[in-house]
């Protein structure tokens, strides 16, 4: 389904039915389609402190479905201790576009990387520098961990509304994943319908750059699709979905009024994409001895103690010249 764009006081609102203002003075929702999946990269390696837009000329970004999905379960509360625990990597995003400044959410998952939605990065129109990130933002006057400017964008190769954003270090040469501890990703082996979850981000119907948490339950789970019964609004795009262990199980994208909100579920395909593109991303089971991806697992082919590793001097492979028993 495609959204209709209606002009309201020189601002644009994307919705399937009616134009709805969704924030302080002039915040609106924007929809967009996924573009190509190729990385967009700039040449800069160090950034200036990003300019922070304030006031009412901010427009929340939301997916092509609907901007505001307030369900009967509207259990939303503000997080004021934003630098504590799993809240710290939750990030306020601004995208400076020709049509205005748009707001969204994301979550830091690596030394210099963050996850958000494809439709959020589409608002940059190919210019990564247009996207600014403020991890742990408290309000529009309080950014305890400063701001960072994007330098590269990589979109998920599948259908899911997911994108990776890489950032330049700040003026102190600190990376975004050094000023906050990156979030832990769930392996989702035990994730199922009816489990309690939270979605944490920066909704556009609340004061600018304030973090809010919504509580609810998973109602549907299949492939990369996850649905839940909690409420969100424009600006929540890219918010992390946490399980009860405070691990990220998905990335919120939007919803359908009176029905559900939804996220890209981190299933095996998504997990493989993330591991291929984010070297230091951490999944909850990575440290388990039996995890084949754990470098200390003796069965991991990259483990130097694995008898089948060609670099192991005890490997009887004929090609290992360091093994005296090799033919």
From Swiss-Prot:
Q: How is it modified after translation?
A: Proteolytically cleaved by aureolysin (aur). This cleavage leads to the activation of SspA.
The biological processes this protein is annotated with in GO are: proteolysis
Q: Name one GO cellular component term.
A: extracellular region
Supply the enzyme class, top level: hydrolase
sequence repeat positions: 289-291, 292-294, 295-297, 298-300, 301-303, 304-306, 307-309, 310-312, 313-315
Location in the cell reads: Secreted
Q: Which UniProt keywords apply?
A: Hydrolase, Protease, Repeat, Secreted, Serine protease, Signal, Virulence, Zymogen
Question: Catalytic residues?
Answer: 119, 161, 237
| Stretches the record annotates as Disordered | 33-61, 283-327
User: Bias category Low complexity: which stretches?
Assistant: 40-54, 286-327
Leader peptide range in chain numbering = 1-29
Region 9 X 3 AA repeats of P-[DN]-N: what ranges?
289-315
Q: Identify the domain of life.
A: Bacteria
Q: Where is this site: Cleavage?
A: 68-69
Instruction: Write out the catalysed reaction.
Output: Preferential cleavage: Glu-|-Xaa, Asp-|-Xaa
Residues forming the propeptide are: 30-68
Give the Enzyme Commission number: 3.4.21.19
Q: Does the keyword Hydrolase apply?
A: yes
Q: What does this protein do?
A: Preferentially cleaves peptide bonds on the carboxyl-terminal side of aspartate and glutamate. Along with other extracellular proteases it is involved in colonization and infection of human tissues. Required for proteolytic maturation of thiol protease SspB and inactivation of SspC, an inhibitor of SspB. It is the most important protease for degradation of fibronectin-binding protein (FnBP) and surface protein A, which are involved in adherence to host cells. May also protect bacteria against host defense mechanism by cleaving the immunoglobulin classes IgG, IgA and IgM.
The further comment given in this record reads: The cascade of activation of extracellular proteases proceeds from the metalloprotease aureolysin (aur), through SspA to SspB.
Belongs to which family? Answer: Belongs to the peptidase S1B family.
Q: What is this protein called?
A: Glutamyl endopeptidase
């Amino acid at each position: 389904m495609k959204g209709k764009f209606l002009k309201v006081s020189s601002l644009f609102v994307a919705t399937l039915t009616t134009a709805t203002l969704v924030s302080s003075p002039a915040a609106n929702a924007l929809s967009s389609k996924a573009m190509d999946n190729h990385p967009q990269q700039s040449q800069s390696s160090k950034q200036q402190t990003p300019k922070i837009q304030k006031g009412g000329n901010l427009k929340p970004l939301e997916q092509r479905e609907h901007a505001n999905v307030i369900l009967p379960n509207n259990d939303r509360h503000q997080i004021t201790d934003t630098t504590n625990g799993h809240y710290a990597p939750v990030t306020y995003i601004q995208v400076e576009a020709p049509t205005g400044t748009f707001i969204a959410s994301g979550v830091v998952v690596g030394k210099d990387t963050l996850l958000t939605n494809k439709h959020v990065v589409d608002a940059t129109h190919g210019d990564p520098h247009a996207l600014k990130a403020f991890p742990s933002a408290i309000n529009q006057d309080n950014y305890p961990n400063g701001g960072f400017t994007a330098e590269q964008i990589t979109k998920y190769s599948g259908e899911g509304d997911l994108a990776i954003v890489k950032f330049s270090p700040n003026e102190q040469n600190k990376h975004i994943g050094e000023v906050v501890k990156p979030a832990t990703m769930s392996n989702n082996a035990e994730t199922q319908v009816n489990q309690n979850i939270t979605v944490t981000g920066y909704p556009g119907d609340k004061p600018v750059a304030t973090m809010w948490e919504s509580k609810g339950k998973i109602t549907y789970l299949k492939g990369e699709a996850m649905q839940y019964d909690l409420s969100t609004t424009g600006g929540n795009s890219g918010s992390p979905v946490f399980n009860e262990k405070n691990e990220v199980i998905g990335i919120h994208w939007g919803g359908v009024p009176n029905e559900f909100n939804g996220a890209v579920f981190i299933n095996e395909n998504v997990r493989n994409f993330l591991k291929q593109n984010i070297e230091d991303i951490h999944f909850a089971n990575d440290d388990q001895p039996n995890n084949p991806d754990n470098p200390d697992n003796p069965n991991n082919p990259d483990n130097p103690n694995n008898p089948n590793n060609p670099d192991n001097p005890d490997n009887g492979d004929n090609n290992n010249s360091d093994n005296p028993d090799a033919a």
